[in-house]
Curated annotation (Swiss-Prot):
Disruption phenotype: No visible phenotype. The lineage of its organism: Eukaryota, Viridiplantae, Streptophyta, Embryophyta, Tracheophyta. It comes from Oryza sativa subsp. japonica (Rice). The gene is IRL7. This is Plant intracellular Ras-group-related LRR protein 7. Widely expressed and preferentially in leaf sheathes. Belongs to the SHOC2 family. InterPro entries: Leu-rich_rpt, Leu-rich_rpt_typical-subtyp, LRR_dom_sf, LRR_domain-containing, LRR_R13L4/SHOC2-like. Keywords: Leucine-rich repeat, Repeat.
Amino acid sequence: MGCCSSRSADSPASRVTRWRSTGIVALRDARLKVVPNEVLQVGNSLRILDLTNNKIAEIPQEVGTLVNMQRLVLAGNLVESIPANIGYLRNLKILTLDRNKISVLPEELGSLSNLQQLSISQNSLSRLPKSVGDLRNMLLLNVSDNKLIALPESIGGCSSLEELQANGNSIEDVPSSICNLVCLKSLSLNGNKIRQLPQNLLKDCKALQNISLHDNPISMDQFQQMDGFTEFEARRRKKFDKQIDSNVMMSSTALDEGIDLN
C-alpha cells in the first residue's frame, strides 16, 4: 500500500494538481528531451516554468496557451528557434534563453509588453528583431556571446532599459538611437569591433554610470573627447567613491569599466 501510495503521489495527474496549486514548475537537470505534456496541462495556473539544463530541442507551439506565465527559463538546452506563439505571453516578465542554439528571434517577441528581463547570451543570433524596440518595460537585455554585427536602430524604443550587455559579438556600429535610452545605467560592449560611439551618448544618457568597452578598436582619446565625458566621469567616480580607491579605479593600462589605452 505504501509503495502504491508513493507511485500515486508522483503520478502525472498528481504533479499537474501540485503545479496548479503552486503555479511553479521546476524541472532543472531532469534529462528532458521534450517539454512534458503535463506542463502544458497546468494552463492558466502556471506562473513560473524552469527547464534549465535539459536537452530540449524544441519549444512546443502550445506554450502560447500559458498566458499567465511570468517567468520562463530555458537556459542550457538545445533550442534552435522560438515559436511565434510566444507573443501571446503578455504577462511574461523574465525570459531566460542563455546557452542554446538560437539563431533568430521572432518579430512576435515585441508583443511581450510586460517583459522586464531578456537574457539570450551564448547563442547564435546574427541579428535582433526590429520589434525589440517595442519592449518598453524591459530593464535588462543580455545578448552577449552571439554573432551580432549590429544593434537595431529600433533599440532606442526600449525607454525603460537600465542595463545592456552585448559582449563578445562582432558589433561595429552602435546606433544613434541608443542616445534615447535615458534610463540606461550600464552599457557593456567588451570584445566587439567598435571604433566609435554616438557623439551624444554620454551627454544624452544622463543616468549612465558604467561603460565597458575593453577589447575594441576605439581609443581612450576618442572616448574622452565625447560630449558629456566630464559629467559621465563624475557620475562614475561618485558611484565607486566608497568602494574602490582611485589607484585601482584608474590603472596604468586601462580605465576600469572603460576603454583600453590603445
